[in-house]
């Protein structure tokens, strides 16, 4: 399958390219606006990978895809919070499959309704949000609640290592909702809380506690519809160095007071200076997903899944869902024709070999009042 990775030499695109290049079923093309960088990176991969200059925002993007004869486009060039659907629309018009790593709430949640007809006409498959959220997060929730009678609350936190490589586009994406009101499902009703404000302590299995604050992601909207009866869904991000978490809280305060209109415009400055704090952090990052509900025996239960990624390997995690889906498509085993959000398309067991490849440790801890091991089946 001829696969083009847009942003193929970027923070996430490069990781996806390294994973897919050795796959015998994939002919890899590294795409970007700089032909020299794309070609040099492709040559470093070997395995017949090629580089190509391509601009996803150009008016002849569809024609470029058709000229290359691309079967699958993997879109990694964020931030997605500010993007429209021109790229996936062009991919559908070119008759190719589509995967992206979007974490923008509106981009992912509105994706099926906006693109399903176009991809059905093309006879192709499109998946939005093939990343840590909601692809991995939904796989974890499905695993933890297997056999349960109901799930009442879902609480997710991602805690990146301070030393892990940071993409400016990712930073711009999270700054976009800093201090902005975010709609969340809490106590069985919709309410609003400001992004990146009011951090709380979050416990991890293999890391010291960190303070996490609300971020706007697709799960906050997708999960209340996906998991019948759930009363609360929360997502937080927890930065390792406390002063950086407090800095985001200050930016949130300034925006709420009308003193800072567009925090995302600070992304270049914060990206350039972020390394100053690396000496105060580590190479260890991770993620936790906690659920509460009623287990198979009718008892109150609380269960948590943890992952810890050392050696600054944390950024591999957001790439895994796209890698797994691309391999499945190359085998002819992809999701059904049409446009989908990624929730529920992958199982946690499919991620397990990828975790092992990078030496990541996972734990399932049953924290419920029942004290019994009634929750998730073992991996």
Spans of features found by a protein language model:
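N-terminal Rossmann NAD(P)H-binding glycine-rich loop of SDR-like oxidoreductase domains
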Residues: 3-22
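Active-site-lining helix/loop region of Rossmann-like oxidoreductase modules
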Residues: 6, 146-292, 299
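Helix N-cap at the beta1-alpha1 junction of Rossmann-like dinucleotide-binding domains, i.e.
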Residues: 10, 34-36
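Generic hydrophobic/aromatic pocket-lining and core-packing "Φ" positions
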Residues: 17, 87-88, 322
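A generic structural motif
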Residues: 23-28, 32
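NAD(P)H-binding glycine-rich loop region in Rossmannoid oxidoreductase-like domains
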Residues: 27, 37, 41-110
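Glycine-/Pro-rich loop/turn segments that contact NAD(P) or position catalytic residues
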Residues: 79-183, 222
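C-terminal active-site/capping subdomain that shapes the small-molecule cofactor and substrate pocket
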Residues: 254-378
